[in-house]
C-alpha cells in the first residue's frame, strides 16, 4: 500500500528539522574551532569543507525531484528551495574563503586567478550561476519571470557539472580522485534518471 501523501502541515514540521540539519556542518566548524580541531591548516580545512558541503547540498537539491516521483510524494518539492539555498550558503562561504584568504580581497589577483586556473574558472562560473538562481528563488521572481523562470533554473544541471569539474581538477593535481568519482557518480545517476524520464514522456507523447 502506498504511503499517504504528505500534507502541508507535515511539510511545515519537516522544514525546521531540515533547516537545523542544514546548519549542522556550520555549527560543527565552530565546535571544532573552539576545541582546536580544525587541523594543522584551518584555512585549508574550512575551504575544502565548505566546498564539499556545497556539493552535498546541491546533490540533495537535485535528488528531490526523483525522490518525490519515486515515492509518490509531490509535496517534497516544497523542500527543494531550502536545500538549494543551503547549497548557495555553503557555496558563498567557499567563495568567500577564496576571495578573502586565498586572494586577500585583491580584485586584480582574483581576475588573474579566474583567467589562468581552469578549476577556478569553472568554480567561479558555477558560483555566478548559483547566485542567479538564489536571487530568483522567490515567488515574486517566479511570477515576474513567468516561463523564463523554469528555463533559468534548469541551469542547476550546469552548476552540478561545473561543480564536479571544479572538484575533479582540484583533486587531479594531487592524484586524489576518489571523492570526485563518488560525487560525480551520484550526479550522473541523478541526471541519468532525468534523461530516462524525459525519454519515456517523449515516447508516450508519440
UniProtKB/Swiss-Prot annotation:
GO BP term, pick one: protein repair
Pfam families in UniProt: Ferric_reduct
Keywords on record: Cell inner membrane, Cell membrane, Electron transport, Flavoprotein, FMN, Heme, Iron, Membrane, Metal-binding, Transmembrane, Transmembrane helix, Transport
Cofactor comment: Binds 1 FMN per subunit. Binds 1 heme b (iron(II)-protoporphyrin IX) group per subunit.
Cellular localization per UniProt: Cell inner membrane
HAMAP family on file: MsrQ (MF_01207)
Function: Part of the MsrPQ system that repairs oxidized periplasmic proteins containing methionine sulfoxide residues (Met-O), using respiratory chain electrons. Thus protects these proteins from oxidative-stress damage caused by reactive species of oxygen and chlorine generated by the host defense mechanisms. MsrPQ is essential for the maintenance of envelope integrity under bleach stress, rescuing a wide series of structurally unrelated periplasmic proteins from methionine oxidation.
Membrane topology of this protein: Multi-pass membrane protein
The protein, known as: Protein-methionine-sulfoxide reductase heme-binding subunit MsrQ
Family: Belongs to the MsrQ family.
